[in-house]
């Protein structure tokens, strides 16, 4: 009998604990509830998300622009190299018959022609990789940029409204009453944002940073201390803004009980996972810089070889034959 009573007590205790464990139990929690972090840190946690989205947008935009620029420059270089290499091949086929007694010069011309062909092939290999990267970037990044901008706007709006609620609006009266308060100004955020509030700061905007969030989500809860006059307009704002934009990546609940008036869960993985994957396509800007440098270096070597080729080609005895090809060399 005693055993049954003990089991019943344990069961009731467990049910009570589960019932008391509010929304977001499996997420990183920021709430003025029990032992969890103070809600003033919500500004830091949420601003971390908006800053990360802003950084993701900037890096994605840079990747798109750099890829386009590098591809355009590489295309011009390769077209020039291929054009001159093709002309050189034409000259060789025309003048072979008149150089039977100039074996040494003919062999040098053939050697230079082969070198130019090899350099063009190497540049072409790099260009092919750039072309593949450009296709991926053009397919993924423009849409991801639009989505990132929408997400950033929504999260930044949430940051602004939460900032108001942690007391950064300066009121003329000690206790503001809805409809009668007079705003004197906006204060500075007093909360110092510790490193723990922003996994993206140390890990970059990457999947490893998303993994730092418990359950890959962030829960923000605010006690009834919240100013009710902010809740109604905020509810309309959220429903037509962030909730509509973020979809199932955001859970916003207005609980008018005595326990919690503000509950917000941001599913970090659903926001950042697809975006990080989209911006990860293609070749990184740092690698693109190396590739265009290599292509430019190949062009310089090509120019040297081509100069040697033309210096032999334009000897007195070969000028007529070269001119007969109607070449622009």
Swiss-Prot record:
Signal peptide (residue range): 1-23
Carbohydrate-modified residues: 73, 294, 308
Keyword rRNA-binding listed: no
Keyword Glycoprotein part of the UniProt annotation: yes
InterPro entries reported for this sequence: ESAG
Keyword tags: Glycoprotein, Signal
The organism's place on the tree of life at top rank: Eukaryota
Role played: Not known but may be related to activation of the variant surface glycoprotein genes.
Protein's name according to its UniProt entry: VSG expression site-associated protein 221A
């Amino acid at each position: 009998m005693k055993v049954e009573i003990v089991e019943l007590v344990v069961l009731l205790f467990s049910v009570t604990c589960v019932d008391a464990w509010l929304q977001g139990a499996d997420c990183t929690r920021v709430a003025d509830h029990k032992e969890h972090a103070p809600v003033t840190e919500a500004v830091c946690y949420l601003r971390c998300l908006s800053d990360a989205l802003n950084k993701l947008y900037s890096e994605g935009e840079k990747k798109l622009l750099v890829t386009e620029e590098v591809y355009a420059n590489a295309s011009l270089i390769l077209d020039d190299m291929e054009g001159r290499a093709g002309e050189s091949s034409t000259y060789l086929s025309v003048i072979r018959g008149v150089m039977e007694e100039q074996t040494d010069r003919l062999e040098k011309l053939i050697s230079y022609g082969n070198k130019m062909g090899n350099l063009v092939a190497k540049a072409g290999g790099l260009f092919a990789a750039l072309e593949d990267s450009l296709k991926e970037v053009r397919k993924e990044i423009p849409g991801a940029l639009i989505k990132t901008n929408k997400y950033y706007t929504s999260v930044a709006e949430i940051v602004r409204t939460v900032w108001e609620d942690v007391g950064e609006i300066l009121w003329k009266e000690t206790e503001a009453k809805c409809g009668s308060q007079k705003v004197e100004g906006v204060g500075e955020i007093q909360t110092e944002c510790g490193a723990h509030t922003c996994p993206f700061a140390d890990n970059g905007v990457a999947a490893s940073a998303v993994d730092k969030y418990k359950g890959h989500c962030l829960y923000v809860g605010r006690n009834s201390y919240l100013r009710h006059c902010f809740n109604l307009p905020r509810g309309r704002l959220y429903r037509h803004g962030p909730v509509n934009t973020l979809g199932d990546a955001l859970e916003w609940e207005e609980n008018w009980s005595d326990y919690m008036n503000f509950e917000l869960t941001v599913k970090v993985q659903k926001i950042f996972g697809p975006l990080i994957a989209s911006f990860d396509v293609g070749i990184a800007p740092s690698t693109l810089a190396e590739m265009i440098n290599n292509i430019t270096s190949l062009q310089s070597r090509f120019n040297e070889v081509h100069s040697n080729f033309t210096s032999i080609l334009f000897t007195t005895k070969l000028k007529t034959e070269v001119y007969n090809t109607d070449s622009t060399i």
